[in-house]
């Protein structure tokens, strides 16, 4: 996989979804930072990295609940800078409010929008999607280039439509999938035919943010290019 996953579960699981990758410039790029991510990254050799980026998809607690802790750990223990990347100015404002309430000084981290990282070889675009009505126009996925691979990461989404223009042949798709719930997430049964059609174009489909990992694995067991993400 292009991404390494620290968690793959939904909001009520014990392993909230988060992933990361490393760059040739000794950067660690983390996608979302729930509390689980803060716990798990401490077991990685973080000293080898010179800088951390955290890409935020949206501000639900199971996606940014550990962000403030990670900022403090990077600053006070690792002595390394953290850049938090928000997909929009509105989301950046919400992140600032949340981190300030938690007692984080804005001087401890850099908070930018995606316009500040367009020069990064691994970044292409953020993708507005539909998820929670309470966060209308504040939920995003990302289009990334990792090790020369076209990567589409949906974040939490109830639709595939915004991501279709980015899914070129041979891409890797990491997609929010629910076995039972659906509604504000893609339901696996409803999306499976779309996933199968993607694989016919050489697209690798990885399922994440799952409410039932075992059930999802059984449902896609017969499809070689559709699978549940594995944990790092």
Predicted regions and their residues:
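Core dinuclear metal-dependent hydrolase active-site scaffold
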Residues: 1-47, 114-165, 232
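Structural motif
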Residues: 27-29, 50-55, 149-153, 171-172, ...
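Active-site flanking residues adjacent to catalytic metal/cofactor-binding acidic residues
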Residues: 31-32, 57, 154-155, 175, ...
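Residues in the short beta-alpha loop(s) of Rossmann-like NAD(P)-binding domains
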Residues: 34, 88-90, 210-213
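Active-site metal-binding motif and surrounding structural segment of the metallo-beta-lactamase
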Residues: 36-85
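Metal-dependent catalytic neighborhoods of phosphoester/phosphodiester hydrolases
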Residues: 65-74, 97, 215-220
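Metallo-beta-lactamase
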Residues: 81-82, 86-139, 228-231
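Cap/insert and terminal regions of metallo-dependent hydrolase folds
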Residues: 159-232
């Amino acid at each position: 996989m292009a991404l390494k996953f620290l968690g793959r579960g939904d909001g009520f699981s014990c392993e909230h979804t988060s992933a990361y990758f490393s760059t040739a410039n000794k950067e660690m790029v983390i996608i979302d930072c729930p509390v689980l991510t803060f716990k798990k990254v401490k077991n990685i050799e973080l000293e080898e990295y010179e800088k951390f980026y955290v890409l935020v998809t949206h501000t639900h607690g199971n996606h940014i609940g550990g962000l403030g802790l990670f900022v403090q750990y990077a600053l006070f223990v690792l002595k390394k800078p953290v850049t938090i990347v928000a997909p929009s100015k509105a989301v950046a404002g919400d992140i600032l409010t949340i981190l300030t309430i938690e007692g984080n000084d804005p001087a401890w981290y850099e908070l930018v929008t995606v316009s500040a990282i367009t020069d990064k070889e691994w970044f292409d675009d953020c993708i507005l999607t539909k998820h929670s009505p309470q966060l209308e126009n504040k939920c995003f996925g990302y289009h990334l280039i990792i090790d020369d691979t076209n990567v589409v990461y949906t974040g939490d989404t109830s639709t595939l439509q915004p991501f279709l223009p980015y899914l070129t042949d041979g891409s890797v798709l990491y997609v929010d999938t629910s076995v039972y719930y659906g509604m504000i997430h893609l339901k696996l049964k409803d999306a499976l035919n779309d996933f199968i059609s993607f694989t016919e174009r050489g697209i690798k489909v990885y399922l994440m943010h799952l409410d039932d990992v075992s059930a999802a694995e059984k449902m896609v067991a017969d499809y070689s290019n559709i699978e549940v993400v594995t944990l790092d």
